[in-house]
């Protein structure tokens, strides 16, 4: 066993901490115990740059004294530390204002089935082997082409995690997961200047990752294709978001449909249930029980059972992303999303990105976005971008130093196609997205 505590030990600690909270005057309480360990190594130009070992554990206890809430945490699991942490949470609760929405999620909503989602796969990787993998990855990148003249390094990471959540409804559950990754970033140069790019792969099972040599070669190829970038004339063009950035585009939709933004009136999609936000040929599903996915779970951060569902169906919003607190604020019921969304799937309309390029004809393929120019309240969108100019459905040349702008509401409704090219490594399966028109500012 890699961890210092067995699942049964963490469950006992959780139950004991909740008992201490009740004995100390809490009318309700919830606690989570977590433990993690892993290692990260990085090399640059064949030399070891960093070796890091990580081992952490923590307890977070939240208590409710009537409608008053207090929270405290510790990394010490000793009896005295548990008592002190519970006391600190109780003391905080007694000094906070009452909140009608504070409290546990309804007992009837607690998960009753908790199966194995196959998310835990140990990687017994020695430090020496990790260094060798990183070197193989970097060397594959450097040997791809003589124009790859420098490296920002290659890294290998392994992470192992376990987590127990429990509350005074009597709910308690354990889950564990792993997260492994290999990455590489290199620099290429020619008479026109220098460019950098990167690539990585990650999985909860290391056997599912691409070989380090392929990751390095992909990083090099992505860097080389950016050489001799130029700008484009300012105008309105179709814009194709590569799958690597399309995930973020849909991420703004998720944020706008999240309870915190909605009850604070800081979303451009307030009161959007039953309203159209995407074209009628698109639907967005949440699938919390996918095997070997980072975001899979049978219960959320409040113990509420998760369920497969449509968030957007045929373009129409069917649900939000709500915790019990945000749901109470909105007069609704939690959707089992305390802690965030779980595995989102956007259906595709085209088989490949190449099909979307042909559909687009002439326009911009975006592969990188920069800056934080997104207003979640108004939907205004303006970001620096880099990618490729496309003519007659074929990539013509790389572009940089441009800005793309629009309103997210319009951009979502103006989607005309989605490719079936989502990356396996992503828990949100979002393919490349073609938007019919945006303002592109160049030279």
Locate predicted features:
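Dual-mode signal for accessory low-complexity, basic/Gly-rich regions
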Residues: 114, 270-443
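Active-site bordering "gate/hinge" segments
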Residues: 1-297, 301-304, 313-314, 394, ...
